[in-house]
Amino acid sequence: MSQSRPLALLVVAALVAAAVLVAAAEAQQADGNKLEGLADALKYLQELDRYYSQVARPRFGKRAELRPDVVDDVIPEEMSADKFWRRFARRR
């Protein structure tokens, strides 16, 4: 009876160790799948970037900038905001 107790503890310890090893192996395999998925996503994003860099063109000259060209274009106190915006709009 005294010898069966340590033997049972040894069997339980071996089963726990085996369970830990199996769990670690599955976790390592899952990390490998994550890396493969990440590599696939990066490849897809690179292909999208290559496609859109060929298809999309910059729109130079299509939009007017809404900021004054010169620092002196600050609204003078005697000029109303409507006059200032009309003068600014004429410049376009």
From Swiss-Prot:
Keywords: Amidation, Cleavage on pair of basic residues, Neuropeptide, Secreted, Signal. The keyword Isomerase does not apply. Residues 1-27 form the signal peptide. The modification Phenylalanine amide is found at residue 60. Residues 28-51, 64-92 form a propeptide. It is found in: Secreted. GO terms for biological process: neuropeptide signaling pathway. Widely expressed in the nervous system. Expressed in corpora cardiaca, hypocerebral ganglion, frontal ganglion, protocerebrum, antennal lobe, tritocerebrum and thoracic ganglia. Not detected in corpora allata, pars intercerebralis, circumesophageal connectives, subesophageal ganglion, abdominal ganglion and abdominal perisympathetic organs. Its main location: secreted. InterPro entries: Pancreatic_hormone-like_CS (IPR020392). GO terms for cellular component: extracellular region. Belongs to the NPY family. Accelerates ovarian maturation in females. The nonapeptide is a truncated form of the predicted neuropeptide F sequence. The predicted form, which extends from 28-60, is probably processed to a nonapeptide via cleavage at a K-X(6)-R-Y motif. Initial cleavage by a prohormone convertase presumably occurs C-terminally of Arg-50, with the remaining Tyr-51 removed by an aminopeptidase afterwards. The predicted form might be expressed in ovary or midgut. This is Neuropeptide F.
